[in-house]
Amino acid sequence: MSQNFFKLLQIPEAFVIDIETLHQNYQSIQKEIHPDRFASFNQEAKMESVKKTAQVNDAYQTLKSPIRRAEYLLELHGLNLHDEKYTAVPQDFLMQQMEWREELETHKDNKSYLEKLAHDIAIKKDEMINLLPRYFEKKEMLPEAIKITRELNFIEKMEQHIHDALIEIH
C-alpha cells in the first residue's frame, strides 16, 4: 500500500497547504532518494529508489494542483467522484457548459475571443477553487466538495479544448 501523500511530503492533511513548504519538502526528499545517489548500490536498492522517486513525484504532482489535491482528499475520506450518487450536474452549470462549448465552436478561429473566453473561465475556476476550503472543514460538507471538484474537472477539460483551439490558430 502506498503512503499517504501528505505524510510522505511532510505537510498537514488539509485542502489549504503552503505550496512553498510542499516544494521545499519535495526537493529535500528527492535529494535523499534520487536514483543517482544509489548508482553504486545493488539492483534491489536501485529499484527501491526508482519506486520511491516515482511515488514522491506522484505525491508532489497531486498535492500541488488544487483540483488533484481535492480529489485525493476526497479519496482519503473514502469518497469516489464517479459514484453514481454524485454524478448529477446542477442545471445552471450544465447550461454554462453548453454555452462555453457553443462559444468555443462558434469562435474557434478567433484568437482574441478564445483568449477572453479562457480568461473568463480561469476566473470562474479560481472562484470555485476558493470555495473548496470551507467544504473540507466538515465531513457533512464533503458532498459539496465532490460537486465542485467534478465541475472543476470539466472546466480543466474546457481550458484544454480552448488551448488546443488556440494552437490550431497558430
Question: For each of these PLM feature ranges, what is it?
Answer:
Residues M1-H170:
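C-terminal accessory/regulatory regions appended to core domains
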